[in-house]
Amino acid sequence: MSTAVLENPGLGRKLSDFGQETSYIEDNCNQNGAISLIFSLKEEVGALAKVLRLFEENDVNLTHIESRPSRLKKDEYEFFTHLDKRSLPALTNIIKILRHDIGATVHELSRDKKKDTVPWFPRTIQELDRFANQILSYGAELDADHPGFKDPVYRARRKQFADIAYNYRHGQPIPRVEYMEEEKKTWGTVFKTLKSLYKTHACYEYNHIFPLLEKYCGFHEDNIPQLEDVSQFLQTCTGFRLRPVAGLLSSRDFLGGLAFRVFHCTQYIRHGSKPMYTPEPDICHELLGHVPLFSDRSFAQFSQEIGLASLGAPDEYIEKLATIYWFTVEFGLCKQGDSIKAYGAGLLSSFGELQYCLSEKPKLLPLELEKTAIQNYTVTEFQPLYYVAESFNDAKEKVRNFAATIPRPFSVRYDPYTQRIEVLDNTQQLKILADSINSEIGILCSALQKIK
C-alpha cells in the first residue's frame, strides 16, 4: 500500500488528473486549506474498510472519495479522497499508523508553506498548456521604449501573433503565417548579415546543421520559415519541438518546457526600424540562434538536462539554473580543436556580439557551474564575461552533477514513449527504470557482438 498527501490541490481535480504518480504537487490556485490524500490498497476484502475505520477513529471527515485500478500494480486499487481541513491535526497520527502499522509508503507535502514545499511542475506534455500563456512581459503589449511602441500597424500585428499563441494547445499543428513584405525585409537583413559570420565564428555543430535547415525548412534570405515546418524537422532530428508563445515566460515555466524537449518559441519579428536590435526574443533569435543546435543530439540532451533539473527545484535553484542557461544556451562558447567557437543563441543571433565575444575584449573563463550559477550578468549590453565549455558532453555531465545538489526528495526522468515525467521515489519506479536500462544494454551487447 502507498499513500501521498497533497495540500491545496483544488477540489475540482479528479484522480485521473494524477496519472500513475505518487504526486509531488503544490497547486497554487486554491488556498482554502483543504487536504487531499491518494493511497493504494491491495485488492482484498475489507482493505478499504480498515482505512476508513482508521479515519473514523481519528475524527477525520471525508468529503469526497473515488477509486480506480492502479496503473502501477495490477493487484491494487488507488483511492483519491478529500479531507475536511478540520482533520489537519489528526493527519500526522494517521500517517504514522499507515507507515508503521499498515506498512504504507507515505509521501507528504509540507503543511508549512514557508518551508519544504515542492513547487508544482508538469508531469505530462499536455500540462504545458497550463502555463504557456502566463507571460511576464511584451506579448501584444509593448513598453514605451520598444521600437514598435508608436507604430499602430506593428502593434496590431503583434496582437495577431499573441492570439495564435494564446489559442494554441499541445498536439495541434502550429498555424502558418503569411508574413508581410516589410517583415521579410527585416528577416533578410538579419539573415544575410549573420550568415556571413557563421563559418568563422559558429561551432562545428551549428555549421553542420545550417545547410539542412536551408534545404528542408526554407531558411533563406527572402523567406521566413514556418514554425510548424521547423518543429517537424526538429522532431525527426532530436525529438525537440516548437511551441508558439506570446512573450517571455518565467524561468521555471520556460525551463520546465525543456524537460519535455519543448522549446517555447516566438513567432513575431522585431520592428523594421531597427533590424539589428531587439529588446526581446523574436523569430530571428529563435530560428537563427536556437533551432540549429536543438537539431544536434548532444546539445539537445544538454538542454533537456537543464530542464529536468528545474522540475520541483526551490526558487533559489531555479535562479541558479536560469543563470547557467544564460551563460551556456544563450551566451556560451566552446572549445573546438585549437579554437574557441560560439554556440549560444544570443551570440549567434547578434551580429555585433558574435564578433565581440571572440575578440580580445571580453574575459573568458572555463565553465564551472558552481561559479557560473551565481555570476551576475547584464541584459542591456555585451557581456563582459563568457564561459567556455570543453564540449557539449562535458557541459551535460556538469549539469547532471549540479542537479544532484538540488534539495528535492526525488529524482526524475523523461519517458519519451508516454511523454511523461516519471518521479523516481519508490522501488516500483526504480524497477521499471532498471528493466528499461537492462533492455538497452541487451541491445548494445547484441550490436557489439555483430560488429565483431
From Swiss-Prot:
Q: What is the effect of changing G171R?
A: In PAH deficiency; severe
The listed outcome for D394H is: In PAH deficiency; severe
Q: What is the effect of changing S310Y?
A: In PAH deficiency; mild; reduction in activity is probably due to a global conformational change in the protein that reduces allostery
Phenotype upon changing A342T: In PAH deficiency; severe
What happens after mutating A345T? In PAH deficiency; severe
What does the record give as cofactor? Fe(2+)
Temperature dependence is:
Optimum temperature is 50 degrees Celsius.
Keyword list (alphabetical) reads: Allosteric enzyme, Disease variant, Iron, Metal-binding, Monooxygenase, Oxidoreductase, Phenylalanine catabolism, Phenylketonuria, Phosphoprotein
Consequence of changing R158W: In PAH deficiency; severe
What result follows from mutating Q226H?
In PAH deficiency; severe
Q: What is the effect of changing S196Y?
A: In PAH deficiency; mild
What does the UniProt entry list as the effect of changing V45A? In PAH deficiency; severe; uncertain significance
Q: Which Pfam families match?
A: ACT (PF01842), Biopterin_H (PF00351)
Heme found in the keyword field:
no
The outcome of changing I164T is:
In PAH deficiency; severe
Q: What is the effect of changing P244L?
A: In PAH deficiency; severe
Name the PANTHER family on file: AROMATIC AMINO ACID HYDROXYLASE (PTHR11473), PHENYLALANINE-4-HYDROXYLASE (PTHR11473:SF24)
Q: What is this protein called?
A: Phenylalanine-4-hydroxylase
Species for this entry: Homo sapiens (Human)
Q: Which gene encodes it?
A: PAH
